[in-house]
């Protein structure tokens, strides 16, 4: 398969619609959307896939309890997901439901292909089964006799099943790990897979079930339904038209450049998924990024603990961009992120209001005060303080690119906020009010130009994360065609000519009353 450059294909996991999506699901999706927007900004042909994983015993049970057929239930949940992603301005290109014919028919073809190749065989499965996780475990994998992933009770089950011969490909997989260091990020996840699953002896994977019927039937043995992971993982291919009459998208976008998954489904994506692709003789994704969870101070989110927060709650009260910013800023690479009402309000007040909004407001006000809103042009001969700011901005932009290209999202945002802080410091260093008083007009012009220019750079940097805020900043500093902004515009320092800031600067973010908002968030988390 010919691999095209200058394209970017990013996927989220397809989400299991067993209930309302909380901020953990929102984080994954916002992250994918941010990376898509960044690569679009760089002029790349970018494509994002998301969707819902709709088969299995758990869905069948939930649908029955709610008095609906499984299909009615999953369609309702998919509609809710699309509504949420619209509210969060997620620019996905395709939303796949695994109950769609374009998926189910191809999964059956893939199963038959594996059978013909001798990758799948029939046997009998006995193991400890976790219904919520839809996963079998050996006795040694259990933790205190319970599911190692979710901590719930497991059942000993025995049934006829088809198995995928994982052992056949395991050496090839480990070799691939070693030869492709960018395949798994962060890198420590590779060692987890090897030490926890591969070295102890990788079990063959059960890929069908007979104890329920809500799933894709095996064509040549219809009492079997194809089990969740062979069904779910292949959505990344079926959505592009793999094994269909039209595989244009597959030729254009596969292999995926970035696949984002939570740590709870890491082994399925880092072991089973690449092995399936090897068996199909398809190229593997360039990078699979495994992120941690968003936790509460008292552990995982749970309705019984009264600590669940939904993205709609944050968006309706504080706006979309602060919600996106908080989710992306609070998730470190190597550990779980923590959500607390106090942390959310603090980020809003300090980062967005004090640092960013005040910088925009002060700068626009000064250009209006000293130059009637007309932005002076670049003089080409920066003084020492100006040059230090220019060099610092260039350095921070390069570091930002390095961090974002390595998917260190929170660290990339830190580089932007370092630049915001340095630009605020530049105002204190240059003291424009003193320059005006002393009638040092050329120095004052250079200072105003550098402030506006840095705001332009900051707006471009935050555009993938907070598009509306970026466009607001650009509009306030006199750049109207925000849709024409491209990443390559970010480095030059002499791009602004004949522009005028708006007459009265508008605060982008207004300071929150800490006690009031903390109490509000605590109250809605208990509902």
PLM ranges: what are they?
Residues 73-129:
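A broadly conserved sequence feature marking short terminus-proximal activation segments
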Residues 1-7, 51, 68, 123-128, ...:
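Basic, alpha-helical terminal appendages of large translation-related enzymes
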Residues 332-335, 339-343, 348, 363-387, ...:
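Long, amphipathic alpha-helical stalk/connector segments used for oligomerization, subunit docking
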Residues 2-50, 97, 102-106, 156-369, ...:
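Structured secondary-structure scaffolds
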